């Protein structure tokens, strides 16, 4: 083989290598660079989350007026501005703060994932529609149940003000919820099953979005959604077992798409046996660690599982620092913070002593 031939082969090989390196570098830049600014901003926001010490200070407020004043140096100031010492007004101010967080994520994140955070807002659509329709069925003032958050607030208000149940069907026309409301009107399902069907629509849309992404974005979003479904299903299962409901009734209220099978747990006799069946799932350890408390107070199940999801998102954030795991982790922390603030406002309004508030906030909602 002549020198010219060897040189030509080397040139060709080097050309292929450099082309591949250029393509690979461009792919990495295209994949990760869009997360640099938003994730840096989110990390700065995370540093401003309230500490345990700050919650202890807030617990000393004693009045809702002091509670609001003590939050004036936080990002909640803009949402609490003009709010009276009404626990419901304060609760809704915190809900607006959470909604603004979702909208900010949609605004600053890469377009290939930003739509997911818009979809997350649709959970308030489901909550609003279900709450308002339930109020209508019970003959209660439906407007009292409207929370002005979500993507369908005008429609929700129109539903609340509707004169007849049939009028609501017209308002929901063209939405993903029209079909299920029609089934409710026809008597094919009751109002509780109607709510479940709305959540099935919501989670199916989230899961469809997650599975349409690529590589780690799909991995992270899909695990997030499937875990959220698992949490809802486990909470539903355990509450139903405590109430003594049969498996076939419980099954109708479970959301498809979760990562764990609950068929065996559906057919056991009581809450303790249901928890024992869950022991073999990936949630077994976290539930086992808190089992004694959970059996006494089922409201602890959801925060225990939510904390598990948060820890998992934090793990993925460390493994994929420039990814959608960072905003998801932050959202979960923000939700937990707002849940604590809402609970604290109610406890202060109910006249609980500071030490008792610290105990409740620190233990039950940690």
Curated annotation (Swiss-Prot):
Keywords: ATP synthesis, Cell membrane, Hydrogen ion transport, Ion transport, Membrane, Transport
GO cellular component: plasma membrane; proton-transporting V-type ATPase, V0 domain
GO MF annotation: an example: proton-transporting ATPase activity, rotational mechanism
Ligase listed as a keyword: no
Membrane topology: Peripheral membrane protein
Any Gene Ontology biological process: proton motive force-driven plasma membrane ATP synthesis
Main location: membrane
Keyword Ligase annotated: no
Subcellular location: Cell membrane
Described purpose of this protein according to its UniProt entry: Component of the A-type ATP synthase that produces ATP from ADP in the presence of a proton gradient across the membrane.
PANTHER family: V-TYPE ATP SYNTHASE SUBUNIT C
Family statement: Belongs to the V-ATPase V0D/AC39 subunit family.
NCBIfam families: AhaC (TIGR02923), PRK01198.1-5 (NF002269)
Assembly and binders: Has multiple subunits with at least A(3), B(3), C, D, E, F, H, I and proteolipid K(x).
Designated name of the protein: A-type ATP synthase subunit C
Protein's organism: Thermococcus gammatolerans (strain DSM 15229 / JCM 11827 / EJ3)
Name of encoding gene: atpC
């Amino acid at each position: 083989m002549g020198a010219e031939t060897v040189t030509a082969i080397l040139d060709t090989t080097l050309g292929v290598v450099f082309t591949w390196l250029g393509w690979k570098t461009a792919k990495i830049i295209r994949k990760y660079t869009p997360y640099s600014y938003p994730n840096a901003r989110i990390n700065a926001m995370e540093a401003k989350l309230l500490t345990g010490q700050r919650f202890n200070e807030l617990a000393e407020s004693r009045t809702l007026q002091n509670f609001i004043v003590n939050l004036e140096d936080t990002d909640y100031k803009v949402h609490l501005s003009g709010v009276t010492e009404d626990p419901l007004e304060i609760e809704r101010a915190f809900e607006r703060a959470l909604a603004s967080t979702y909208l900010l994520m949609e605004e600053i994140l890469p377009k290939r994932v930003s739509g997911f955070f818009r979809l997350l807002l649709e959970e308030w659509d489901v909550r609003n529609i279900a709450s308002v329709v339930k109020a209508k069925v019970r003959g209660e003032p439906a407007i009292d149940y409207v929370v002005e958050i979500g993507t369908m607030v005008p429609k929700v208000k129109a539903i609340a003000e509707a004169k007849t149940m049939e009028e609501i069907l017209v308002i929901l026309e063209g939405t993903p919820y029209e079909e299920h409301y029609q089934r409710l009107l026809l008597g094919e399902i009751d109002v509780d099953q109607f709510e479940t069907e709305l959540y099935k629509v919501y989670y199916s849309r989230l899961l469809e979005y997650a599975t349409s992404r690529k590589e780690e974005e799909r991995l992270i979003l899909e695990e997030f959604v499937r875990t959220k479904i698992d949490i809802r299903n486990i909470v539903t299962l355990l509450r139903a077992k405590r109430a003594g409901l049969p498996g076939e009734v419980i099954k109708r209220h479970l959301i498809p798409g979760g990562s764990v099978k609950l068929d065996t747990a559906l057919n056991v006799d009581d809450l303790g046996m249901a928890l024992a069946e869950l022991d073999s799932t990936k949630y077994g350890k976290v539930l086992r660690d808190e089992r004694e408390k959970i059996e006494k107070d089922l409201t602890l199940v959801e925060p225990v599982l939510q904390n598990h999801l948060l820890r998992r998102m934090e793990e993925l954030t460390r493994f994929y620092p420039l990814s959608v795991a960072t905003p998801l982790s932050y959202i979960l922390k923000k939700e937990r913070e707002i849940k604590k603030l809402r609970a604290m406002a109610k406890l202060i309004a109910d006249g609980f002593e500071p030490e008792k508030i610290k105990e409740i906030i620190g233990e039950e909602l940690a």
